[in-house]
Amino acid sequence: MRKILFAALLLALTMTAALGEELPKAPVNMEIPPEAIPTQAEGELETYGLTFPEEMPLAARNFVLTARAQFEQHPFEKLPKANEYTQWYYRDKREIGWCSVFQIWCAYHSGLQLVRYKQDVEVAPGDCISAMEGRVGNVYYAFEEHGRWLQCDQVEAIPKPGYLVIYGVRGSTPYTHVAIVESVTELGDGVYELTTVEGNINSTIKRMNYRYDATPKKKYYNMSVVPEGEITQENCQYTLQKDTWYITGFCQTW
């Protein structure tokens, strides 16, 4: 038994040495969702000219501004799969998809309450929340069980800044990618123009600008490009990431 324990200790030390520099440590035990940290006061974050609904809570506003600040820090920059967001969350250098980890990082640093799927925790109607789930499907399940999920075929599925948007792939999965809604413009007839901040789009942080049809003729064809002559947002990707993607629904963070 002693030989086994010694061998295990030696292996752990060898792996630590192989990693080289010390890994950035998450401020909490990431197996357990942390309590919301105090959100920054209004005026302490760059607003980038964004305006928000009057009823939008400060933490939800900071969620958007924190995500935007990360984009401005790494605009369209190709990041490794093991990056500052994944190492903060997983506490190691694993290479893995990180779209949800990005929103978790932004939520934690904005003061949102983080919840998990199948976690016995009470969420009040006025609480600002996000899901501490690395898998996009579990983000959906976490919001659904707390009554904060808006399916796209529901009349009340109206996007708002600070919500999460979950994308699906036609003929494959309804939960392939998650992003943060930065701004929403209602165009009439159930059509909205969305600008989003998205982690891990081709290994980058991008701002995407496109149109969402809440009442499409075909259920899985609810995204379209903004006509070239009607583009008003700057520094965005204006093409759809993939033609087979569609919006599955929205997570009500607030």
Annotate each predicted stretch with a short phrase.
Residues M1, M15-A26:
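Intrinsically disordered, low-complexity Ser/Thr/Pro-rich tracts
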Residues M1-A7:
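N-terminal Sec-pathway targeting helices
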Residues A7-T14:
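Bacterial N-terminal signal peptides
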Residues E22-M30, E44, Y48, Q154, ...:
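Aromatic- and glycine-rich peptidoglycan recognition patches
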Residues L23-K118:
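N-terminal capping segments
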Residues T66-Q70, A142, T253:
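Residues that form generic nucleotide/phosphate-binding pockets
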Residues P80-W88, Q119-E156, R211-T244:
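Surface-exposed intrinsically disordered loops and tails
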Residues Q113-K206:
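...with weaker cross-activation on analogous glycine-rich loops/strands in unrelated enzymes
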